[in-house]
Every structure is written in structure tokens, then in C-alpha cells.
Amino acid sequence: MTLSVDIPRDPMAPAAARRAIEALSGRVADDVIPDVKLLVSELITNSVKYGGEGALRLQIEAEGPRKLRAEVIDQGVGFVPVARDRPATDVGGWGLHLVQTLSNRWGVHEGSTHVWFEIDR
């Protein structure tokens, strides 16, 4: 199953992305969906904060109930991906650390802000 949706860039974008992910119910395992929602929310939040102008695109390709690839694409200039270990007392900046920790693989397409992660359990 493929999910592809444009999400308006505004403070409610993470919630809109989580609602869109509900379309995966029944095709993706119930214990995988919460992690997908969390990681997509973190990436969408980063895109809203740093991703330039225009809509955001969320694409998810579910290859089975426990295997999927999610991508968040925006109009930003790109960045060097760094997921740092964070002190437990830090309030913010956990997004890429969570992506690194909860996904099997993740990365950024060079030259754009096109962040992806894969879950394969």
C-alpha cells in the first residue's frame, strides 16, 4: 500500500500527518503504527520549523504489516543529518535521535530536505 499526501505547513501539520497515517490501519501491524506516527510527527515538526515555504509531502510505502518506508519532503535547502546522543534532561532536539533509535535505517537525500526512515520488524 502507498500513502502519499500533501500537508499544509502550519502548526497543526504533525496532527494532520498522524491522521493520514490512520489509513494504514489493517495493513500495518497495530504495534508498528505508533512508532510510525511518532517518527513522522518528529520529521514533520522539523520541516515546519526549518523546511522553507510550501506544502510538505508525506509518502509511506507499506510492503507488509511490519515493513515500511516513510519519507517527508519539504522545500528546504537540506542539511547534514546528525542524530546526537542527548542528555536525558534536554527538553528539545530529540527528533533525529528518535528516528535513529526506533527505525532500522534512515537518511537524507543529498541536496534537499527529503528525510526517510525504514521499519522492518
Which residues does each predicted region cover?
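Conserved beta-strand-loop-beta-strand hairpin that lines the nucleotide-binding pocket
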Residues: 1-4, 47-121
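Conserved short strand/loop->alpha-helix "switch" segment adjacent to the catalytic nucleotide/phosphoryl-transfer site
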Residues: 15-41
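STAS-typified acidic loop motif
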Residues: 2-18
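Active-site rim helix/loop that mediates acceptor-substrate recognition in acyltransferases
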Residues: 41-42, 48
